[in-house]
């Protein structure tokens, strides 16, 4: 009887344990889900279930513990990834910061170099210290060399910036040729003034003023020569003309003969005209006290006129033979004025002829 009771009690205990295990089984499933999500609390409850392995569910409980360990590994990998991301972000930020600092230092230096390259007067090759430096005016006798030195001073880059829009497409050789043509037209004096900084218009005005003063002095000298020659001719030949005017009808022929003689005398060498002494201009003398002198001059002039008429075949002989002996009649004021005008006209005509002869020579 005791044996049967003990077996019954054992069976009851087993059934109660199985019922307790069956009741605990639905609690293990949410524990696995919580363990797979990485929560350590689910893993701990699964570990508690592992203590019930005495009922033969050891394998199941072992799987529960494994799920807990898997959750812990998943959580650790996510932490490592987040740390790696943080490291990458810090590395990228440090690299970008260093690049920004480098650009801050590099860009100003590049800008300075470009600015200096654009605005500097230095050209390729630099300055040759072996060649002695001389001013541009030193080469004024050789205009071609002076132009070459000017182009070396300015340089090709700066010249291209200085050129107007019309000459932008021209080459350096064409520009040099144009400059050479313009330079040949300028005098050395004007080039020196331009190099000294004087205005070109001022130099042109000065040159025109110099030319005008020269022309004015030439005109004044010609007028002086004309006046001197007219006065000398008038003083020397006036008495003869006065007495010839007193003739009856042949006065014009006599005056024409005298005019040819005066022209031949005036057209002589210029040196003789310059060397001729300037006689005082006392052309009008008193009428009463000069009658005897007039008679002598009349006789002399008549003889000269007769000699000229015989020597010139073109003149008619009747003109010289028809001159009557002069009478003692004083010339009128109108005759004197006409004679003076005629003498001046002859002197001007002779000077014009002399100037025409000098020009071809």
UniProtKB/Swiss-Prot annotation:
**Which keywords fit this entry according to its UniProt record?**
Apoptosis, Coiled coil, Isopeptide bond, Phosphoprotein, Ubl conjugation
Q: Which domain of life is it from?
A: Eukaryota
Mind telling me which Pfam families this protein's record contains? CAAP1
Q: Which residues carry this modification: Phosphoserine?
A: 89, 120, 203, 312
Q: Where is the composition biased (Low complexity)?
A: 19-28, 272-281
Q: Where is the composition biased (Acidic residues)?
A: 199-210
Q: Tell me the protein's name.
A: Caspase activity and apoptosis inhibitor 1
């Amino acid at each position: 009887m005791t044996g049967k009771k003990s077996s019954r009690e054992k069976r009851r205990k087993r059934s109660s344990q199985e019922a307790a295990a069956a009741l605990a089984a639905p609690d293990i499933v949410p524990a696995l889900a919580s363990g797979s999500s990485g929560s350590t609390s689910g893993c701990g409850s699964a570990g508690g279930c592992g203590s019930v392995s005495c009922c033969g569910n050891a394998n199941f409980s072992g799987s529960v513990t494994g799920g807990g360990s898997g959750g812990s590994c998943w959580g650790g990998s996510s932490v490592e990834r987040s740390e790696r991301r943080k490291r990458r972000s810090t590395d990228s930020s440090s690299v970008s910061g260093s690049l920004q600092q480098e650009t801050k230092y590099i860009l100003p230096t590049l800008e300075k170099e470009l600015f200096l390259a654009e605005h500097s007067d230095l050209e390729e090759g630099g300055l040759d210290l072996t060649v002695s430096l001389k001013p541009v005016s030193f080469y004024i006798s050789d205009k071609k060399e002076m132009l070459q030195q000017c182009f070396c001073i300015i340089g090709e880059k700066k010249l291209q910036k200085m050129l107007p829009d019309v000459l932008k497409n021209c080459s350096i050789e064409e520009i040099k040729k144009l400059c050479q043509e313009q330079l040949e037209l300028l005098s050395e004096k004007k080039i020196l003034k331009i190099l000294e900084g004087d205005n070109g218009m001022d130099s042109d005005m000065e040159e025109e003023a110099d030319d005008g003063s020269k022309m004015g002095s030439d005109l004044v000298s010609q007028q002086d020569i004309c006046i001197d020659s007219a006065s000398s001719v008038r003083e020397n030949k006036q008495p003869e003309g006065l007495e010839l005017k007193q003739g009856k009808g042949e006065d014009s022929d006599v005056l024409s003969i005298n005019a040819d003689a005066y022209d031949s005398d005036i057209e002589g060498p210029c040196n003789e005209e310059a060397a001729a002494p300037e006689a005082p201009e006392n052309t009008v003398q008193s009428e009463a006290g000069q009658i005897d002198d007039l008679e002598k001059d009349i006789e002399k002039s008549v003889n000269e006129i007769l000699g000229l008429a015989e020597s010139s075949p073109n003149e008619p002989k009747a003109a010289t033979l028809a001159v009557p002996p002069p009478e003692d009649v004083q010339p009128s004021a109108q005759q004197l004025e006409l004679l003076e005008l005629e003498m001046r006209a002859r002197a001007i005509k002779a000077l014009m002829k002399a100037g025409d002869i000098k020009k071809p020579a």
